């Protein structure tokens, strides 16, 4: 049992009792236990916001072209190739698409996003607000693959006057307006890539992804001025920075961010609760100015908040055939703040399930973790391949979540590959350290000699995958024949 960690529901229920007192000029009396419960809820609530802010600072405190994913705000940073075998900058790297990342800054004005005609090719431009909710997802599924223009506006911007936009800012008549919940936004763009031979085609598409401040749209782009901030910690991972903050630093930083990034309209209950411990939108926070009782209550909130998150992880997804399936409330979390925080901690930047889902293998058909000392297969019966409208893949990682170097330089198998099917039409994929034979190498995903795991990716999943009617088949461990010694 976790000491002093009542659930979010419990602490929010206290709001009803406190409502009349909230009308008074002075703060209502609160016990240390009540304050601690609210502080833990506040820690969980703010976790994605702080994670996004540190990630933004690291990713944008760089000159364009110096590093994958890093570059100034209001520019697209295009990743031109898959990560190499020895790349360890990101866990569970993607070998299906090439990324195009952009951090939008709309503190002064809206921005215009332009995309080229991808000629039917799958692409995705999910837009995350600073709370990590995907509020828009232009791309293959929603807006098609023709060239398009999107006007992204910050909170409180003036009403949509389409004709005035077209005349004053020279926007195309078919420009689509997207209202952003926060003035900073992260676009994590992806473009389908069928292996290295496809790079040149994809790079031409990436070159057509553009960001422009509204006042500069249609004009010659101004040179980008980059001022590197030496105070930004560029070496320590955002997760580590957030997880090691003291309560005073954490909540002070959260209060400053709350001045710029408004809470969602449905957050009012927890906002009302946080006022009881001195955290209020539009105001700075100093833990040293609190009553000693409140200081004690807040001091251990980070540790207990992280314990609560760790406790919840094992039950966050359903497990079927050894695969962890997480399709509910992904990308848009509503008031499920605990799940939102956990996703930000373990996989910042999650998509909407309608765009992509990621079954994670936890065990083989015997219930044991995967190990390269054994040989495994997964078999999709004829007509029972992963149900997608776009494409699917399976990627293999070592126990730390990194790709494994191998003679084929193959880190994933994907539906675009020329697989060799069985006579009955079924498809069998092999996961093992040594080649299954030259005639089967088209279906082979090389494994390390030690522990490994698998991630399946379904892009544009069909309804049966989203609802659980379809689930991945089990990963079967091959039976080994043990010789009997003469005794």
Please provide the spans of the model-predicted regions.
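Bacterial N-terminal signal peptides that target proteins for export
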Residues: 1-10
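General helical structural elements
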Residues: 7, 17-18, 461
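C-terminal segment of classical bacterial N-terminal signal peptides
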Residues: 14-23
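A compositional/structural signature for long, glycine/proline-rich flexible linkers
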Residues: 24-487
């Amino acid at each position: 049992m976790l000491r002093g960690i009542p659930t979010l529901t419990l602490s929010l229920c206290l709001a009803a009792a406190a409502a009349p007192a909230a009308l008074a000029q002075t703060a209502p009396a609160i016990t240390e236990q009540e304050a601690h419960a609210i502080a833990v809820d506040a820690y969980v609530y703010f976790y994605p916001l702080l994670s996004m802010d540190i990630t933004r600072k690291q990713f944008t405190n760089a000159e364009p072209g110096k590093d994958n994913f890093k570059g100034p705000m209001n520019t697209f940073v295009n990743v031109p190739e898959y990560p190499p075998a020895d790349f360890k900058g990101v866990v569970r790297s993607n070998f299906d698409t090439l990324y195009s990342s952009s951090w939008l800054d709309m503190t002064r004005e809206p921005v215009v996003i332009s995309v080229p005609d991808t000629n039917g090719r799958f692409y995705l431009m999910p837009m995350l607000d600073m709370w990590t909710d995907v509020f828009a997802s232009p791309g293959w599924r929603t807006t098609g693959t023709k060239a398009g223009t999107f006007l992204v506006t910050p909170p409180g911007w003036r009403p949509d006057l389409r004709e005035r936009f077209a005349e004053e800012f020279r926007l195309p008549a078919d420009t689509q307006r997207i209202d952003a919940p926060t003035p900073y936004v992260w676009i994590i763009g992806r473009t389908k890539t069928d292996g290295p031979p496809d790079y040149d085609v994809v790079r031409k598409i990436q070159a057509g992804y553009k960001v422009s401040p509204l006042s500069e749209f249609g004009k010659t782009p101004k040179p980008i001025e980059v001022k590197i901030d030496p105070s930004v910690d560029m070496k320590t991972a955002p997760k580590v920075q957030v997880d090691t903050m003291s309560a005073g630093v954490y909540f002070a930083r959260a209060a400053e961010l709350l001045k710029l990034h408004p809470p969602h309209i449905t957050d009012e209950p927890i906002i009302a609760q946080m006022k009881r411990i001195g955290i209020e939108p539009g105001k700075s926070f100093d833990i040293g100015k609190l009553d000693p009782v409140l200081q004690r209550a807040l001091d251990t909130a980070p540790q207990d908040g992280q314990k609560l998150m760790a406790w919840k992880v094992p039950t966050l997804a359903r497990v079927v055939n050894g695969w962890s399936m997480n399709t509910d409330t992904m990308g848009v979390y509503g008031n499920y703040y605990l799940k939102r925080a956990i996703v930000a901690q373990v996989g910042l930047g999650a998509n909407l399930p309608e765009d992509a889902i990621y079954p994670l293998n936890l065990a083989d058909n015997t219930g044991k973790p995967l190990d390269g000392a054994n040989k495994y297969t997964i078999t999709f019966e004829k007509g029972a391949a992963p149900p997608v409208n776009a494409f699917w893949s399976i990627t293999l990682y070592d126990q730390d979540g990194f790709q494994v170097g191998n003679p084929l330089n193959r880190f994933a198998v994907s539906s675009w590959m020329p697989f060799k099917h069985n006579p009955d039409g079924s498809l069998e994929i092999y996961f093992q350290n040594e080649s299954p034979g030259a005639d089967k190498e088209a279906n082979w995903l090389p494994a390390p000699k030690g522990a490994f795991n698998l991630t399946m990716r379904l892009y544009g999943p069909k309804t049966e995958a989203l609802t659980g009617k379809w689930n991945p088949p089990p990963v079967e461990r091959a039976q080994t024949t043990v010789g009997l010694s003469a005794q």
